[in-house]
């Protein structure tokens, strides 16, 4: 749908890569690059190995998720709970950076529970910055670890993109990508006036046809001539490819 937009995988827990079906977890349709592998974990050595596997699989970026608030993720000591341990995050990212040549980035929130002051997220970014990370994807909401479901955590905590913009001002040598609540390419254009990039989450799967307009609207490329019928044909081919690699029934069997 877009040749320019960077696609991020769903978060893959590092233990799943170490002990699971690595070929399936790291498999993707070639030709859709740039693609980023998003990892979840808190073991520096394990994450470094997973980052290396990701680079070998052809990923253009390795991202560490420090934004997911789900209880299951919390219990595994990764996701947004890691924002409460910034030095641990810095150690993980440093180990990942030392193992690969592609960029290593971090995705995080602007706060956790009652830790919502600018100083909290500034100190988190500062600690990670000192370890060498220079690309920050900021979901401009705090996460509430108790009382809200992951879905509610994407809506109920208020957006504060101004706080994210202050991070950009305070760390001018770094790249900041804003995420959260952006639904139109017009909003993307507005936010690109103060951020280096914009990440679409739910809108990308609620309204995927929007992606056909990205290259023209944001990069000045010629308008897409892709039709919906062509997209459906490509999707059918992809399903056939996945089925050849591993029968879909094997993934859904209980």
Which sequence ranges carry the predicted segments?
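Short, hinge-like loop/turn segments at secondary-structure boundaries
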Residues: 24-28, 80-82, 122-123, 154-155, ...
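Alpha/beta enzyme core
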Residues: 48-78, 86-176
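Short secondary-structure transition/capping segments
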Residues: 19-22, 74-77, 117-118, 148-151, ...
């Amino acid at each position: 749908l877009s040749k320019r937009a960077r696609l991020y995988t769903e978060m893959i827990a590092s233990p799943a890569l170490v002990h699971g079906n690595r070929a399936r977890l790291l498999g993707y349709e070639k030709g859709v690059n740039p693609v980023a592998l998003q990892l979840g974990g808190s073991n520096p050595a394990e994450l470094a190995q997973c980052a290396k596997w990701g680079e070998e699989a052809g990923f253009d970026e390795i991202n560490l998720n420090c934004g997911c608030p789900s209880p299951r993720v919390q219990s595994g000591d990764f996701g947004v709970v890691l924002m409460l341990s910034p030095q641990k995050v810095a150690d993980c990212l440093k180990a990942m950076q030392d193992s690969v040549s592609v960029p290593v980035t971090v995705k995080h929130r602007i706060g956790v529970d009652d830790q919502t002051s600018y100083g909290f997220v500034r100190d988190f970014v500062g600690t990670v910055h000192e370890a060498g990370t220079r690309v920050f994807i900021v979901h401009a909401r705090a996460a509430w670890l108790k009382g809200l479901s992951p879905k509610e955590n994407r809506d109920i905590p208020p957006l504060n993109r101004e706080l994210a913009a202050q991070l950009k001002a305070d760390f001018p040598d770094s790249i900041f990508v804003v995420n959260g609540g952006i639904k139109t390419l017009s909003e993307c254009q507005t936010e690109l006036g103060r951020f280096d990039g914009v990440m679409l989450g739910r809108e990308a799967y609620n309204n995927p046809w929007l992606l056909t307009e990205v290259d023209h609207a944001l990069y000045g490329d010629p308008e897409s001539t892709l039709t919906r019928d062509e997209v459906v044909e490509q999707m059918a081919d992809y399903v056939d490819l996945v089925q050849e690699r591993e029968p879909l029934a094997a993934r859904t069997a209980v």
